[in-house]
Amino acid sequence: MSARLGEGERFDVVGLCHALNELFGEGEQALERRAALLEEALAIVKPGGSTVVIEPALRDTSRDLLAVRDRIVARGYAVRAPCFYRGSCPALVRESDWCHADHAWRAPSLVEDLARAAGLRRESLKMSYLVLAPKGEAWREPPAGRVFRIVSEPLEGKGRQRYIGCGPEGRVGLALQQKHRTAANAAFFELRRGDVVRVSEAEPRGDGLALTDRSEISVLARAGDPAQG
């Protein structure tokens, strides 16, 4: 790749959009070759720059991207987004899980017309993605406190709201009962996939965390925005 782009050239951003999953077939060998290609892309990124990978939000393509992510992380690269967790991706533990983003989007009129004619809905853009740092750059420190990126839709149950969050401690269920709703935690009931939140006063419950009337929820970033704080 670097030879085709020109000897010694460096770029602020190198992007691969709906391309990686189309290359090298299937299986472990394909994943290894995709990881090697990403290393080539990262080698031509300037310090402080990024390689951005965007793939379809389907389960299989997403899980393949996460498997490539694990290989890249194992080789010493840092993920700028969406990951806070620095180990092997916890979404790969269960075959039914995957990770994708869902961003609200106002389509151009031409796209709206085509979508309407095809019977499609295009109120949002769904994708699986990685933003990777070049070799030698450290993981960015997450915001202070107990921080999670919401990686599910709202999982409503009888008298409660639940989400899956993924943060520095891994993938965790977060739940809050309506009877424990307060002004300090009310934002929990309005979260969207991709939001970054800070949680306080949460209690371990089963394989997740239960929020109480003492809990506070701070929204540090909405989906697609950089996390601050």
Which residue ranges define each predicted feature?
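C-terminal lobe and adjacent flexible extensions of AdoMet/dcAdoMet transferase-like proteins
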Residues: 98-229
